[in-house]
Amino acid sequence: PANFVLGFGKIDGRRVVVGGEDFTLKGGSPTEAGLRKSVYAEDLAVKYRLPLVRLHEGAGGSVGKSKHASLPSAVFNAPRFRSVAQAMATAPVASAALGAVAGLPAARLVSSHFSVMSNSTAQIMIAGPAVVERAMGEKLTKDELGGAGVHTKNGTVDNAAVDEPEAMEQIRAFLCYLPSNVYELAPVSLCNDPVDRREERLLEIIPKERRRAYDMRRIIKSVMDEGPVFEMGRGYGKSQIMCLARMNGQPVGVWGNDPKVLAGAMTADGANKARRFMELCEVFHLPIICFVDEPGFMIGSQSEREATIRHGANAALTSALLNVPWASVMVRKSFGVAQVAHYGPDAYVLAWP
């Protein structure tokens, strides 16, 4: 049997395609039948224009001998990643790491619009501890090599969850802001938040002392519709905040600088995080609201080693090519080349306070 489970389901009443490796068969290591089925999952998402949810727990390719000899499949075989790319260009793709994930399943995991890993059960690795020890001389546990403490900080995954049920809930929350496919608009919810609601705390949230930091997340929470705000990638590129929220019931992408981290300066990681978020909003037609408190690119020797100027320029170029509506609010400052990324083409710009 194929060691990949595939089917249809519903999330908040919307149909989705869902699939994942069966770890009880060869540890989820891709077999010919399992690989064909995983490609078929992506084909179904494209054909029926449905969101794709992947639940991963599988090893990389097996080096063991099979009783039934067959010609090996080339790692660059087009269907493997053409189907992944086509799915991501057509419908939302959300992935969860629920156990140890390595090799090809790990590559599919990160090839998604949103990824989450279970803090208690999941690890993501190119190769496992035994291979790493033999090849590199590093003796590490699976968690030390590829646990949530590693991959939420380097941007391999967007978020961590306490356990598998919370990982599923995060996928549900992510999908509720997005359309079923790129040919539709995001679902607008009934808004019970009065348009004349006043947030008096905003009057004093910005310190008069310009060297003092403040809580940008409080500003975002106060301005958006009352209710949940879904943050992505909080542990990575920490000076930049990326959220999905609603404004008058309309799903929007929200980007803000975090003055509590490097005064909000854009790092290489922050630039990559912003670029990826802008691409998500562009693909699924989400307007962007940007709260700008940008001192510029982070400076110093580490910043130069990380090629911050290159990654930052790429973020600015991505911003310049977007077509979605864009509104920017200058909260305190907006300096340097880095500020360019915060204002999309023909942005509606406000200065506050």
What residue spans do the PLM features occupy?
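Ligand-binding clefts of soluble mixed alpha/beta catalytic domains
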Residues: 1-353
